[in-house]
């Protein structure tokens, strides 16, 4: 039985598949994760793999063996359903639909995608375009018991990004519903670093309560199914998305702990996207999440931890699984 957060909540991390799919599951188990987020294919390319990767059956078996779930698949960074360009829109619909169709093979429950950018067309036009795209995507994917849910992730608010507030997310949900998108097929993800960058004070438990109450009244907290649990290097409201080790950034342990213990979020799956996955900080941040949830004091991080940046988590399955570049 994997280690759980309060009320049996599950904590995962975004881990790379480039070194092998089964090894990624073993790594998740080793670091104490009880859920997993992955890229199912190359996150920076439009071309998708033809057919399942060779390790997929063994990957599923290992997930069952270690009781790691739910699996979230992060869609490619290129996807943008909110922009006015027809070519980009069409490619985005095709790629997101492909990842949704592929998700059951990975035991994927969620396909997480950024809300996107209206690229100057305006918030209203971008919202309508996104809703049209979601309708087209879901029309291409069978609605069966194993189908994954599309999960829209909030934006830090840089440039023309949509989804920077509960109001904008609610408008997206309403626009999608008006086009016949069932609520059971469309969920939402709160990225704590994004919300902080957009100006939401997640360091303050009272402000968190206000935000969640607003989300519940406008959208419904049952549709908030994922939280990307990240601290932030950036100033609140800066629109700068720079993730930090848990409890070492500007959000801090008080706010993150409130999110981890909040009674209205017992159904949510939490996923870390913190720095230094390749340097062993994945295990450290999983442990810190449990300490924060329990209200325990955090150990000091070594000085070099603050210099760590990216990780191989930004890759899909390696060449032995036919990764396409």
Predicted features, each with a name:
Residues 14-18, 39-43, 76-78, 116-118, ...:
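Active-site beta-loop-alpha junctions enriched in small/polar residues
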Residues 124, 162-170, 196-267, 275:
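Gly/Pro-rich active-site loop or hairpin
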Residues 87-100, 123-136, 165-175, 206-209, ...:
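Short, electropositive alpha-helical surface patch
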Residues 2-5, 26-33, 52-72, 97-107, ...:
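Acidic (Asp/Glu)-rich catalytic clusters
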Residues 81-187:
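Active-site acidic/histidine proton-transfer and metal-coordination neighborhood
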Residues 34-39, 69-73, 186-192, 221-233:
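Non-cysteine beta-strand/loop elements that form the S-adenosyl-L-methionine
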Residues 28, 74, 92, 103, ...:
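Conserved, mostly hydrophobic/aromatic
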Residues 1-75, 79, 83-98, 295-325:
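N-terminal pre-domain/capping segments
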């Amino acid at each position: 039985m994997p280690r759980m957060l309060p009320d049996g909540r599950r904590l995962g991390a975004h881990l790379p598949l480039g070194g092998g799919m089964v090894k990624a599951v073993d790594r998740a188990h080793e670091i104490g994760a009880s859920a997993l987020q992955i890229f199912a294919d190359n996150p920076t390319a439009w071309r998708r793999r033809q057919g399942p990767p060779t390790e997929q059956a063994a990957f599923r078996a290992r997930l069952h063996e270690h009781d790691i779930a739910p699996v979230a698949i992060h869609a490619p960074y290129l996807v943008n359903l909110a922009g006015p360009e027809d070519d980009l829109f069409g490619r985005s619909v095709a790629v997101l639909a492909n990842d949704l169709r592929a998700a059951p093979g990975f035991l994927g429950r969620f396909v997480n995608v950024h809300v996107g950018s209206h690229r100057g067309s305006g918030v209203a036009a971008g919202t309508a375009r996104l809703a049209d795209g979601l309708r087209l995507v879901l029309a291409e994917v069978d609605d069966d018991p194993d189908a994954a849910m599309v999960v829209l992730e909030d934006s830090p608010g840089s440039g023309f990004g949509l989804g920077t507030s509960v109001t904008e997310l609610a408008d997206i949900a309403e626009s999608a519903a008006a086009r016949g998108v069932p609520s059971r097929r469309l969920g939402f993800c709160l990225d704590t670093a994004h919300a902080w960058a957009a100006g939401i004070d997640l360091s303050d438990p009272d402000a968190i309560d206000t935000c969640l109450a607003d989300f519940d009244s406008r959208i419904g907290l049952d549709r908030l199914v994922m939280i990307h649990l990240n601290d932030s290097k950036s100033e609140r409201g800066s629109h700068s998305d720079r993730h930090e080790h848990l409890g070492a950034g500007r959000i801090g342990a008080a706010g993150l702990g409130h999110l981890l213990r909040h009674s209205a979020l017992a159904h949510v799956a939490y996923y870390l996207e913190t720095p230094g996955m390749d340097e062993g900080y994945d295990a450290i941040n999983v442990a810190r999440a449990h300490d924060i949830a329990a209200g325990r004091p955090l150990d000091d991080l070594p000085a070099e931890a603050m210099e760590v940046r990216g990780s191989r988590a930004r890759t899909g399955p390696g060449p032995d699984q036919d990764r396409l570049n």
